């Protein structure tokens, strides 16, 4: 099975299955000299882990991370960083009825069609459980980018037909983690929670969307044609299970705008740098960053694991039969996907920062003395 690695310079390679022994990720390309400990990773994993509230799965995973390579005396060494998160609360027995009877709208049939077999416990590799690895890797990327003044943030801006009004970046930083829905507009968050409860009571689920934004990203990142920043970021977001759309700037609303309205005149900022007068393009022009905030929206369909009675077929007996998907599942995805979106945004931006030479890929220039003293007292000075 290919397709388990993301990134060119900052490479994230993952393994693990929903009900296997553990999830794991190897990060190659992290520069030496980054101060890093498990607590840095754990803080982000705790935001994503299950069992946080009544609107998340009740699966009781602590998601405790163990760093087993690439870090010495609290600093990265420049070698691959290995991280393992054990699965502590897997219960595969409830999935036995689906071994030969695919659950509607899951990856059960397609994985079997491709590989001739599949790990049926909890959906195996197709499960969103796998995103725990991405958040672990994203925590490292986030820590590096923070040192360069780059900050990514996301919040849930729509659940079903309930949409939040626009909020500022500062409001996202302040309010997103204040409620279970992770919506930065408190009043809308309450209405969203009520709607989720309504569907959950009916044994159903609901979709939604996440607004994301990154600030401090320099101009000039991206490699057109097929490796532009929006293309790669789109790949990152579409890799998140259940993602149905990704858009930047005006997104689908751009079809209603005349060119004379959407086009933005150029002007100079207070430092004398050329800058568009607006940012309807989401910080991206020609597939390359403009230096303005990158922003957009990603949408998720409703979770497919629901207890409502549905129809399937048993390819072993040749019969059509009723099916009810039992187990512990999320009634809505965006609240737990917020840290996943932030992780993929951070990973993608860091990869381009390394590719374009904005960050030294071998060692962090901001703190070379610490690395020299702690690790290699006889090594040459940083150029």
UniProtKB/Swiss-Prot annotation:
Named cofactor requirement(s): FMNH2
CDD domains xrefs: Chorismate_synthase (cd07304)
Region entry Disordered, spans: 361-383
Cofactor: record remark: Reduced FMN (FMNH(2)).
EC number: 4.2.3.5
GO CC list: cytosol
Keyword Lyase applies: yes
Protein residues bound to FMN: 125-127, 286, 301-305, 328
Keyword Amino-acid biosynthesis tagged: yes
Name of the top EC class for this enzyme: lyase
Biological or metabolic pathway of the protein: Metabolic intermediate biosynthesis; chorismate biosynthesis; chorismate from D-erythrose 4-phosphate and phosphoenolpyruvate: step 7/7
UniProt-listed Pfam families: Chorismate_synt (PF01264)
Binding site for NADP(+): 48
Family: Belongs to the chorismate synthase family.
PANTHER family membership: CHORISMATE SYNTHASE (PTHR21085:SF0)
Protein name listed in UniProt: Chorismate synthase
Natural source organism: Haloquadratum walsbyi (strain DSM 16790 / HBSQ001)
Lineage, uppermost ranks: Archaea, Methanobacteriati, Methanobacteriota, Stenosarchaea group, Halobacteria
Gene responsible for this protein: aroC
